[in-house]
UniProtKB/Swiss-Prot annotation:
<dbReference type="GO" id="GO:0005829">
    <property type="term" value="C:cytosol"/>
</dbReference>
<comment type="similarity">
    <text>Belongs to the MurB family.</text>
</comment>
<dbReference type="Pfam" id="PF01565">
    <property type="entry name" value="FAD_binding_4"/>
</dbReference>
<dbReference type="InterPro" id="IPR003170">
    <property type="entry name" value="MurB"/>
</dbReference>
<dbReference type="InterPro" id="IPR016166">
    <property type="entry name" value="FAD-bd_PCMH"/>
</dbReference>
<feature type="domain" description="FAD-binding PCMH-type">
    <location>
        <begin position="33"/>
        <end position="197"/>
    </location>
</feature>
<keyword id="KW-0560">Oxidoreductase</keyword>
<dbReference type="GO" id="GO:0008360">
    <property type="term" value="P:regulation of cell shape"/>
</dbReference>
<feature type="active site">
    <location>
        <position position="176"/>
    </location>
</feature>
<keyword id="KW-0285">Flavoprotein</keyword>
<dbReference type="GO" id="GO:0051301">
    <property type="term" value="P:cell division"/>
</dbReference>
<dbReference type="GO" id="GO:0071949">
    <property type="term" value="F:FAD binding"/>
</dbReference>
<comment type="pathway">
    <text>Cell wall biogenesis; peptidoglycan biosynthesis.</text>
</comment>
<dbReference type="InterPro" id="IPR036318">
    <property type="entry name" value="FAD-bd_PCMH-like_sf"/>
</dbReference>
<dbReference type="GO" id="GO:0071555">
    <property type="term" value="P:cell wall organization"/>
</dbReference>
<keyword id="KW-0963">Cytoplasm</keyword>
<dbReference type="Pfam" id="PF02873">
    <property type="entry name" value="MurB_C"/>
</dbReference>
Length: 305
């Protein structure tokens, strides 16, 4: 279907300024790479998401969903069809020890809201840069905590635009994975069950984790965080470091000198630079140690022609 027609129609469904054509997706990822989206939309509520899905299904237009782009590489050829950004779906409510957070809310902000209400259980998330939806998608975690420990249920939207509530068991959580990598559900909101705690103790733990993160991670450069999952009985960063790969650069992307588990965009790198460096690191580590590193970061989109 003609993308100009898609743009025109969706402009009548969403608020002014929330539908764009040929939007550069590098502006919507932490690593600052990615080509153009044919049509880029940023809905503000569930009804608008349903309208987009209904329209896309009617005309067989592919739809790709983005959170805040913290753990994704979008290829240099961009994304065909409709790209839906969920960054405006950000509501958070607190009732007793329960927090309900919408998909586009930053998980860091949710952890701070928990602190404000003297609730413990989300301290580990105080340095995770992703959205709530992304955190559920990959069962995000850090410093011994992970989303699956505190999630009780979630509201999702099916590929037909139907709303469903899923219990935690349906997520099939594992280490940095969930069922959402293999189905077409869109995570809309999550319910977290926390415990009452002491404000000063919660804050002290968050301050400690923030200090560790800032002292060990290359936050001064664009990155996607940890590139690889932790292999059994080992650490990806240590294997990469012991392979002598810190500082290895392809194009504008290099293995961080500060933390070997990170790859940083130091000089206008491209998605292809990033992908090539990932493959080089995987090949080198496997040759030296016999360990095949598994990607944690998602790669989506089309290659540049």
């Amino acid at each position: 279907m003609n993308m100009q027609e898609v743009y025109k129609y969706l402009s009548t469904v969403l608020p002014e300024g929330h539908v764009k054509q040929d939007e550069m997706l590098k502006n919507h990822t932490h690593i600052k790479v990615g080509g153009k989206a044919d049509v880029f939309v940023a809905p503000t509520n569930y009804d608008e998401i349903q309208e987009v899905i209904k329209y896309a299904n009617e005309y067989n237009i592919p739809v790709t969903f983005l959170g805040n782009g913290s753990n994704v590489i979008i290829k240099d050829g961009g994304i065909r069809g409709i790209t839906v950004s969920l960054i405006h779906i950000t509501g958070v409510t607190v009732t007793g020890t329960t927090i309900v957070a919408q998909c586009g809310a930053a998980i860091i902000d949710v952890s701070r809201i928990a602190l404000d209400h003297n609730l413990t259980g989300l301290e580990f998330a105080c340095g995770i840069p992703g959205s709530v939806g992304g955190a559920l998608y990959m069962n995000a975690g850090a410093y011994g905590g992970e989303i699956s420990f505190v999630l009780t249920e979630a509201v999702v939207m099916t590929g037909d635009g139907e709303l469903r509530t899923l219990t935690k068991e349906a997520f099939e959580f594992g280490y940095r994975k969930s069922v959402f990598a293999n189905n077409h559900y869109i995570i809309l909101e999550a319910r977290f069950e926390l415990e009452e705690g002491v404000h000063e103790e919660i804050k002290a733990k968050m301050d400690d984790l923030t200090f560790k993160r800032e002292s060990k991670q290359p936050l001064e450069y664009p990155s996607c965080g940890s590139v690889f999952k932790r292999p059994p009985n080992n650490f990806a960063g240590k294997l990469i470091q012991d392979s002598g790969l810190q500082g290895k650069r392809i194009g504008g992307v290099e293995v961080s000198l500060k933390h070997a588990g990170f790859m940083v965009n130091v000089d206008n790198g491209t998605a292809q630079d990033y992908i090539d460096l990932i493959h080089f690191v995987q090949k080198t580590v496997e040759e030296k140690f016999g360990v095949k590193l598994e990607r944690e970061v998602r790669i989506i989109g089309e290659d540049k022609e």
